[in-house]
Amino acid sequence: ELLQIPDNYKVLLMQGGANMQFAMVPYNLLNENETASYLDTGVWAAKAEEEARLYGKTHIVASSKPDAYRYIPKTFEVPKDSVYLHVTSNNTIYGTEFFEDKSYDVPVVADMSSDIFSRPVDVSRYGLIYAGAQKNLGSAGITMVIIREDLIGRSARAKSKMWDYGIYAKNNSLYNTPPVFAIYTCLLTLRWLKKLGGLTAMEKRNKAKAELLYAEIDRNPLFKGHAVAEDRSRMNINFVPVHPEDEAAFLEFVKPYHIHGIKGYRTVGGFRA
């Protein structure tokens, strides 16, 4: 209801987190002699591409790695023989995010683990969406997959039942005992989102919060943002001190204000709000 998912899609609930989907997507969609395209926008996108190599060929359409993943590549070509294009809609470590649901000549597979339900999404523009619940949806232990029905069973390989999207679809995600409490926490979150006014209202709230933080980062001469302005994430606001030696002092400074856990990822440094 919140995502207005079309009737020709199945919603699957399973365990394993997004890391398992890095493998399950190519396992279910990609044959050994075929190619899947990947847009490299950060560590998680790179991990997904690495897993796909176990099941077929991969092609990286573009990468922002040479510029420390500070932006999302906009200009690239997707080979028409690609089985799918994989994108990571929000990059937690580097603070970049997609804000458009773009269509391509091939099905788009999106890892939306860290921005699902943060804004309205046109599900019809995707072949498959997956999201680990622990960021925006519920507690750890459950992963949501939204898959277009014609993609179920696409790969010809013999499949383990526990790794077969078709098995989950046929059994309403009840092939084995599901993580009931984790699913229940998702239900509570979805009810809360609906009560707030849905995803349009949530997007408005997220924009307001992010703009407030980014305005201070841009104003304050002690800090600078990591991501380029047009690709700045609303989910993960990454910033670094202009003088790296001030990092430890700032972490100590904010403790009396009950601000904890904002230390940035080791490859970027700085802070992450």
Where are these regions (language model features)?
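Conserved beta-loop-alpha segment that forms the PLP phosphate-binding cup at the N-terminus of a helix
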Residues: 8-33, 37, 45-46
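Substrate-binding/gating loop at the entrance of the active-site cleft, primarily
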Residues: 40-55
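Conserved PLP-binding active-site segment of the aspartate aminotransferase-like
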Residues: 237-243, 259-273
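Conserved PLP-binding catalytic core of the aspartate aminotransferase-like
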Residues: 223-254
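Active-site C-terminal subdomain of aminotransferase-like
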Residues: 133-214, 228
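Conserved active-site segment immediately N-terminal to the catalytic lysine
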Residues: 109, 123-134
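Active-site phosphate-binding strand-loop segment of PLP-dependent enzymes
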Residues: 52, 63-116
